[in-house]
From Swiss-Prot:
The protein's name in its UniProt record: Serine/threonine-protein kinase pkn2
UniProt-annotated binding residues for ATP: 19-27, 42
Superkingdom field: Bacteria
Role: Regulates the activity of endogenous beta-lactamase or related enzymes, by blocking their secretion by phosphorylation, in response to an external signal yet to be identified.
One Pfam assignment: Pkinase
Membrane-side (Periplasmic) residue stretches: 624-830
Enzyme Commission number(s) from the entry: 2.7.11.1
Length: 830
């Protein structure tokens, strides 16, 4: 025992009082003399310290632990020997042990899962340093509070060992009990070799205890626990805690952790952390506590919704009905709302085991929706067992809802609500398909859609608002549909019926400030979209959830009158109406003597008009071929009317299908559909002479493909094109603002070593605006490799940006390459 007020480690730390003791040593409250800061001082038992090789092993593990920097792992401040004692000095964590927190009973899943995820991430951090904890239990976890909420911390590495220790360092050889019997892995229980998956088993026992309030085995003696961990089947978690029975994915995850065979458990703490994050997102649509689903007003119950909260994948952060109407909440866990809140969980199994499903369309209570969970009638929510096989994707997420929907449903009859929703769906749902979007969930008035292309998402939103505008002109004001359309792009986990990830939180914040009739999107969408398709203007900013950072918002510019976006997406009508203003402009142009008179005399002859247009550079040569099926198909594709273009091509005669223009239109259509193998197959069928006249739309599409696919595949596809034309076109694209086609054009020119006509510093600086971390990393690395001091401002911008938030933590998006290059370039200039 150390006496109070004694000094250790050359007087750097003062002992204040004992805190406790264990099998490996005593722990004292101490003070760092130089700073007056509280610390925890762990002193190894003298008899252990005297064991051969223990002092060296202690130093080695302390050195490794000191390199672990993670908010869920207690920080090592110092270590060394003081007289006959080996001391480990750690930060002093104020809070409550998980053991004490669990004394009253199990922890609600909504509180438990974020803490467990933090612990899994901390465990991953120590595993990455080559350390196995070996003694995970509630007593070794502390819960502290901060301005950002609760933080779980891993403590006590007294019997941790290196993942690959030498034989002489094995703790088992010096007679120390390895771990706590209640939480031992089967490998530890039988004295077999352990690896990091042993900690995952112990983590499973801890999780079982947290969620159910009891252990998976009854014991009660240490030898009983050893035997049960080694060979007995654990009590199923849903039997230990029946209120968790609807959480199928979470149950599966916990029981996987308790597998005797380590190969059947999650294979890393990183995988476990991802599964817990997915479980939290999926489960947070439920109320915390005993897992009661959020209140679902039944048709005819008389309950009046008042909040209209749309929830995709997570629950509202507040159960109060005083929040803004029509908001989409994606973060936190919704407390049980009052009967008047109208918060409904759709597709969640009822307590009787039957699926609740979506409420009937006729119900006025369908305005509030919870997205991201499937019915438990046979299919698990996306958590635990299968979450780890869903790969992150960079997608554009769209959220739409009717402004004032909740108030409106409360004053309308069931029949009126049914008609309103039917009209809403008929107007908007076809547009999702036409723009290659995928409807993930539809709940009442709210749609959750994902697009692979930000441009397609923006164009779909514009088409929606135009179609709604036309509808609203034909009905009384009280019956108009005023819809908000919000878009954000980022890395998500997208399953057939849910979208999980930070972009869901961001789009919630966007929806809070968006206005009906607008298409509102974030800077991530604005940077990635094709800006030639639509003009946008800034419309304020939002604060990113959980961060003190501002995110700029944009909205598509509306027309001064008529349809907000010019009705360019109308599915009916022809291009004939567009011909009138073009001819009027032609009449106003002063033509050379004779030609003007000729045009006035023969203006109704399409071929001659087309000839005049070509001479004027007006870009309307298609007038001479307005009956050509291929030309009409291209016109529809350029207007974003993919389905109509496909219908026209399918209806073409056999003779028309052999037209070069229609064959090329088929290439462009396959690109628009995202069918890239079919696109390249159709391209390979084009004759050499057809490639001479290939439309820019096809070249643009191939450049876009080049922005996201392997270089060699597309290099072969483009090898047949006339090199001079391809190079000239792609040089123009490479000088544009960032888009996938800009990036693809730049990659192609570099690949074929034909980029000498491009300002590479400017082009790669543009690519730094990509929302894709991998593209920004490649661009930063290339800028660094150019060795041009002109690139310093762009690379300084990279280093000033926050790192991207990935599913496994922060991601380096070229920060290190840029910082190294800046240092090197500045040294050269000096």
């Amino acid at each position: 025992m150390l006496a109070p007020d004694s000094l250790v480690l050359d007087g750097r730390f003062r002992v204040l009082r004992p805190l406790g003791s264990g099998g490996m040593g005593e722990v004292y409250l101490g003070e760092q003399v130089s700073l007056g800061r509280k610390v925890a001082i762990k002193v190894l038992h003298h008899d252990l310290h005297a064991q051969a090789g223990m002092a060296e092993r202690f130093k080695r593990e302390a050195r490794l632990l000191s390199a672990v920097e993670h908010p869920a792992v207690v920080r090592i401040v110092d270590f060394g020997e003081s007289g006959d004692h080996a001391c480990l000095v750690m930060e002093f964590v104020e809070g409550e042990s998980l053991y004490d927190v669990l004394t009253p009973g199990p922890m609600p899943p909504g509180r438990a899962l974020p803490l467990l995820q933090q612990l899994a991430e901390g465990l991953a951090a120590i595993h990455d340093k080559g350390i196995i904890h070996r003694d995970l239990k509630p007593e070794n976890v502390f819960i502290s509070k901060s301005a950002r909420g609760e933080q779980a911390r891993l403590l006590d590495f007294g019997i941790a060992r290196l993942v690959e220790p030498d034989a002489a360092s094995s703790v088992s050889q010096i007679g120390v009990v390895l771990g706590t019997p209640e939480y031992l892995s089967p490998e530890q229980a039988v004295g077999a070799k352990v690896d990091t998956r042993s900690d995952l088993y112990s983590f499973g026992v801890l999780t079982y205890r947290v969620l159910s309030g009891r252990l998976p085995f009854d014991g009660p003696l240490p030898r009983n626990f050893l035997s049960q961990h080694a060979s007995a089947a654990p009590l199923p978690l849903d039997r230990a805690a029946p209120t968790l029975s609807r959480y199928v994915g979470l149950l599966s995850l916990v029981m996987r952790l308790l597998e005797k065979d380590a190969s059947k458990r999650p294979q890393s703490a990183h995988e476990l952390a991802d599964a817990l994050a997915a479980a939290h997102s999926a489960l947070s649509a439920f109320t915390p506590g005993l897992g009661t689903p959020a209140y679902v007003p039944q048709p005819g119950s008389g309950a009046t919704p008042s909040s209209g909260t749309s929830v995709f994948g997570t629950g509202s952060a507040s159960g109060s009905s005083s929040g803004p109407t029509g908001t989409a909440a994606f973060a936190g866990v919704a407390p049980a709302p009052q009967a008047s809140s109208g918060t409904a969980a759709f597709g969640v199994a009822s307590s009787s085991g039957s699926a609740s499903g979506a409420l009937p369309a006729a119900s006025p209570h369908t305005g509030t929706a919870s997205f991201g969970l499937k019915s438990s009638g046979g299919v698990a929510a996306v958590t635990g067992g299968n979450a780890s096989v869903v790969k992150p994707q960079n997608l554009t997420v769209m959220l739409t809802d009717i402004q004032g929907f909740t108030e409106r449903t409360s004053r309308q009859t069931h029949e009126e609500n049914a008609r309103m929703l039917e009209t809403h769906d008929k107007l908007l749902m076809p547009l999702v398909k036409e723009h290659d979007g995928r409807l993930v969930q539809k709940r009442g008035d709210a749609l959750l859609v994902v697009f692979r292309s930000p441009t397609a998402g923006v164009l779909c939103g514009m088409a929606m608002q135009d179609r709604l505008w036309r509808h609203n002109q034909t009905v009384p004001e009280v019956d108009r549909l005023n819809v908000r359309v919000c878009l954000h792009a980022g890395e998500v986990l997208a399953t057939p019926d849910s979208v999980l990830g930070e972009p869901m939180e961001v789009i919630e914040a966007v929806e809070h400030v968006a206005s009906a009739g607008e298409v509102t999107f974030t800077e991530a969408v604005n940077l990635a979209r094709n800006r030639a398709e639509a003009t946008a203007e800034p419309c304020g900013a939002i604060t990113l959830p959980g961060r003190n950072e501002q995110l700029q918002l944009y909205r598509c510019q509306r027309a001064a009158e008529g349809p907000p976006f010019g009705d360019r997406f109308a599915s009916q009508g022809s291009r004939g109406n567009a011909l009138a203003p073009l001819l009027a402009k032609l009449q106003a142009v002063k033509l050379p003597t004779g030609l003007g008179e000729l045009l006035r005399q023969r203006r109704r002859e399409a071929a001659l008009v087309a000839g005049a247009v070509v001479l004027l550079g007006a870009g309307a040569a298609w007038l001479s071929q307005r009956n050509d099926a291929g030309t009409r198909a291209f016109a529809l594709l350029e207007d974003g009317k993919l389905n109509e273009a496909l219908a026209l091509m399918d209806a073409a005669t056999d003779e028309e299908k052999e037209l070069p223009s229609l064959r090329r239109a088929r290439v462009a259509a396959n690109h628009a559909k995202g069918h890239h193998i079919s696109e390249r197959t159709a391209l390979s069928h084009l004759k050499e002479e057809e490639l001479e006249d290939v439309e820019p739309l096809i070249l643009d599409g191939l450049a876009e493909d080049y922005g996201k696919e392997p270089l060699t595949v597309l290099g072969n596809a483009l090898a047949r094109f006339p090199k001079d034309r391809l190079r000239a076109h792609y040089e123009d694209l490479a000088e544009e603002a960032y888009s996938l086609r800009q990036w693809g054009a730049l990659r192609y020119l570099e690949f074929v070593k034909a980029a000498d006509g491009v300002n590479l510093v400017r082009a790669y600086s543009e690519a730094l605006n990509s929302p894709d971390c991998d593209i920004r990393t490649q661009a930063a690395n290339r800028l660094a490799g150019l060795g041009d001091a002109d690139a310093i401002p762009a690379m300084e911008r990279v280093t000033s940006l926050p790192k991207a938030k990935g599913l496994l933590g922060s991601k380096d998006c070229g920060h290190e390459a840029a910082a190294t290059a800046i240092k090197s370039l500045k040294q050269k200039s000096d």
